[in-house]
Amino acid sequence: MAEEGLLLPASSTSSSSSLLSEISNACTRPFVLAFIVGSCGAFAFGCIIGYSAPTQTSIMKDLNLSIADYSLFGSILTVGLILGALICGKLTDLVGRVKTIWITNILFVIGWFAIAFAKGVWLLDLGRLLQGISIGISVYLGPVYITEIAPRNLRGAASSFAQLFAGVGISVFYALGTIVAWRNLAILGCIPSLMVLPLLFFIPESPRWLAKVGREMEVEAVLLSLRGEKSDVSDEAAEILEYTEHVKQQQDIDDRGFFKLFQRKYAFSLTIGVVLIALPQLGGLNGYSFYTDSIFISTGVSSDFGFISTSVVQMFGGILGTVLVDVSGRRTLLLVSQAGMFLGCLTTAISFFLKENHCWETGTPVLALFSVMVYFGSYGSGMGSIPWIIASEIYPVDVKGAAGTMCNLVSSISAWLVAYSFSYLLQWSSTGTFLMFATVAGLGFVFIAKLVPETKGKSLEEIQSLFTDSPPQDSTIF
């Protein structure tokens, strides 16, 4: 296991061929449609994240915003994230995955229109707040829905590919933001959600949610529609129903609602999920995402060239991660991704240090561009998607809603802290700010290497039993 954490399997080529065969067999029309709908939330999320940086200058100029006003616009998104996180678990458990997707897409549309027609800061912030609430719900909902409908051998690839849509959304809006006016760009942001709404009439509900709410008779029918009418889904349906019944019996004995998550048996899974979710945020993700324009300008890089280059690299990283997640495994990609983010933060700090001390002035812009590209490429290859994949895999159905709320809260609060404080941290010390982020990334690498196990190739029920029965003993590479 120690070697598996660092090296790609020797049979990666044959594994890739097998993966392609499995993908071909699994691509039934209902599954593909459900996958696309589940992935569109990630794309909408990416569009929202990618909107701020390229439009910063024009929005501030057109609406006469101060730095404090724009800092609020950037950070109020995470206030909405916190509000969405507070309700996401209860909402998805109460009304189901599909109806919750309805709610998030309607909020996305309203938020974009509010921004597009804003004449002052209040409507601008209201639109951003509504978008934040929707993201706070969908950022966990999407991975959960996809992992619950996907076959076990494709679960990682499907979830990672879905999260790749977030990287695509960021990249598309980074690029469009250099040529499209900010109001028109907001109108374009409505299109994905408007396209999803009619498709929601044709996708199935999660079979695991159906089992949880007592609709056992529908589980096998939904699995047949997802896997194909000729597939034998009896074993999969039996495993889902058996495990759900076991969880219900435990819930009857101990029904403490949200606080049930804090029992000793969930301590390991809660720690893994929460720390993995928080690492990208505390490692400066929102700082890079919302203020890339400021970083480029401060170090002498052309903003348009920087945005386009960064977009291409992030998309490439996301594609690479999607291809490898079910071949090399989640853990290997997490380690490589986290190491790359550490390198990106460190070289960004060095570029600011050189700029501030007037050293190597001709090379500093190149180093700054390189550092941002390394950061986003590394983030896209692993830390952008895999923490949410793991978080959607490791919690039993009875605490999945509470766990989703907790993970979302941690992500949202840490994102808000970074987004709101980032501009002030840059004024304090640009070099010191990115050294802080590099330190977090380095500590995150050690955490993953020491504690995070591999979940590739296991059913959700096997993973959840593994995490709740006893912490895995074979996760360390040191």
Curated annotation (Swiss-Prot):
Keywords: Membrane, Sugar transport, Transmembrane, Transmembrane helix, Transport. It holds the Pfam family Sugar_tr. GO terms for molecular function: sugar transmembrane transporter activity. The keyword Repressor does not apply. It is found in: Membrane. The keyword Transmembrane helix applies. InterPro entries: MFS_dom (IPR020846), MFS_ERD6/Tret1-like (IPR044775), MFS_sugar_transport-like (IPR005828), MFS_trans_sf (IPR036259), MFS_Trehalose_Transporter (IPR050549), Sugar/inositol_transpt (IPR003663), Sugar_transporter_CS (IPR005829). The chain crosses the membrane at residues 31-51, 67-87, 106-126, 129-149, 161-181, 185-205, 267-287, 305-325, 333-353, 366-386, 406-426, 432-452. Gene3D superfamilies: MFS general substrate transporter like domains. It is a multi-pass membrane protein. GO terms for cellular component: membrane. Belongs to the major facilitator superfamily. Sugar transporter (TC 2.A.1.1) family. Sugar transporter. This is Sugar transporter ERD6-like 15.
